[in-house]
């Protein structure tokens, strides 16, 4: 299919120094630094890139038939394997009715996640490549916890499920009044959420509070799409409601922690006014 499992070692073997890629990354880093300071340059550059990428994707989408038994998964735009997409994927692997389905994971660095290929029905594509766009055009379902790429739109027979990745205690999208975001103005942020809201079929909310915030953040009431919000909870949280003492013991053992202590997890969110080229928001 998109990735020949038999050639994993060859595909990801050490390669000679790629000077063209290094030059591209240097130019990209330079452009990002300019974009932070010059909003006009940033907006015009993004507009040109979006139009070009959308035209290219539309050509792929128009010639590929949707496959009802192909599902595309992505976590944080391909940066990791986890959260609710992982929970849904791993649940589906245990269900006989999905034995003839094909699962495709999109990653930015596939080499880190080749373990998913242990399942014979699972494949990998690299985000923002032609293979990724072919997978998106083919899959009946898109299961994401972050916004889908702006230039990729679903066909009428495709279902984009927006799982998001948390409760919006911090303002999102249209709820942002003043933006100190390092890479986007308030209007640019709203445009991104506007595009996403026009694409997803469903967005899952973990609570009534979250459901209300999603409606306002994506401006769903104004566009008549409040019915897309499903207050069903996050699949990733099922484990927290059903864990056993053995699960706790396994975690403590794996992290090599003392078993006679109580633990507090501090997990601060990202800061949208801090952005480092090559890394992202920090």
Task: Put a short name on every predicted segment.
Residues 1-70, 94:
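Basic, ligand-binding patches in group-transfer machinery
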Residues 22, 112, 131, 246-250:
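Exposed alpha-helical structural elements
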Residues 37-49, 73-77, 235-239, 272-273:
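Acidic/glycine-enriched edge-of-secondary-structure segments
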């Amino acid at each position: 299919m998109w990735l020949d499992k038999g050639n994993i070692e060859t595909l990801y073997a050490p390669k000679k120094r790629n000077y063209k890629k290094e030059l591209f990354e240097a130019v990209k880093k330079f452009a990002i630094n300019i974009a932070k300071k010059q909003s006009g340059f940033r907006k015009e550059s993004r507009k040109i890139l979006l139009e070009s990428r959308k035209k290219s994707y539309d050509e792929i989408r128009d010639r590929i038939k949707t496959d009802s038994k192909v599902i595309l998964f992505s976590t944080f735009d391909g940066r990791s394997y986890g959260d609710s997409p992982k929970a849904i994927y791993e649940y589906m692997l245990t269900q006989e009715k999905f034995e003839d389905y094909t699962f495709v994971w999109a990653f930015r660095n596939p080499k880190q996640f080749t373990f998913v290929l242990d399942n014979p029905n699972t494949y990998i594509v690299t985000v923002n490549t032609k293979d990724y766009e072919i997978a998106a055009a083919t899959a009946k379902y898109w299961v994401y916890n972050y916004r889908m790429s702006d230039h990729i739109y679903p066909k009428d027979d495709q279902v984009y499920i927006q799982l998001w990745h948390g409760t919006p205690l911090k303002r999102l999208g249209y709820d942002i009044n003043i933006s100190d975001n390092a890479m986007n103005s308030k209007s640019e942020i709203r445009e991104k959420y506007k595009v996403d809201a026009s694409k997803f079929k469903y967005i899952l909310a973990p609570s009534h509070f979250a459901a209300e915030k999603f409606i306002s953040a994506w401006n769903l009431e104004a566009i008549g799409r409040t019915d897309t919000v499903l207050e069903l909870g996050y699949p990733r949280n099922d484990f927290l409601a059903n864990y056993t003492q053995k699960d706790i013991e396994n975690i403590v053992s794996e992290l090599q922690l003392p078993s006679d202590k109580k633990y507090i997890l501090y997990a601060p969110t990202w800061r949208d006014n801090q952005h480092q080229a090559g890394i992202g928001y920090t």
